[in-house]
């Protein structure tokens, strides 16, 4: 049996997660049958579930990967910057569709909700760490608590998610995000 390089293995996992994201976003968790996953991903069930033991693990890994990406963007660009990047993204439909399905699963599956909450905590901490750094550098207001600013940003994220989930489009979002950013900045920044 030929040895598969770590690079090839990583590429296969990326392909599987990308295809699974599209399938879950298109059909929902329940509608993403194994046959649909195979068709969308372009790999056999054996190849898919060799890496991810079952559909639950695959869904959780896609959700985890999306949250990791969001936390990475938030660490680099702030939460508003992360929202901007995602809104401009080519895979926007799949990302937002997956996010809607994650929200649905959180509401009906306590086990999934508990695992998802761990990823949410990581994002929350990333956002708060970035806000503390921004405050220390004088870029954001000092007259509002960090927790209040963080909750405001989380509400903005959820509002954008809701708007996009309802297919209301992105028109005007950039201006709204500019407004939120300017409201949080220190005078002169």
Curated annotation (Swiss-Prot):
The keyword Metal-binding applies. GO terms for molecular function: DNA binding; magnesium ion binding. Disulfide bonds: none annotated. Residues 10-70 form the HTH tetR-type domain. Residues 33-52 bind DNA. It comes from the Bacteria. One of its GO terms (biological process) is regulation of DNA-templated transcription. Mg(2+) binds at residue 181. Citrate binds at residues 79-80, 130, 134, 185. Pfam families: TetR_N (PF00440). Keywords: DNA-binding, Magnesium, Metal-binding, Repressor, Transcription, Transcription regulation. InterPro entries: Homeodomain-like_sf (IPR009057), HTH_TetR (IPR001647), Tet_transcr_reg_TetR-rel_C_sf (IPR036271). AcnR negatively controls the expression of the aconitase gene acn. Homodimer. PANTHER family: HTH-TYPE TRANSCRIPTIONAL REPRESSOR NEMR (PTHR47506:SF6), TRANSCRIPTIONAL REGULATORY PROTEIN (PTHR47506). This is HTH-type transcriptional repressor AcnR. The gene is acnR.
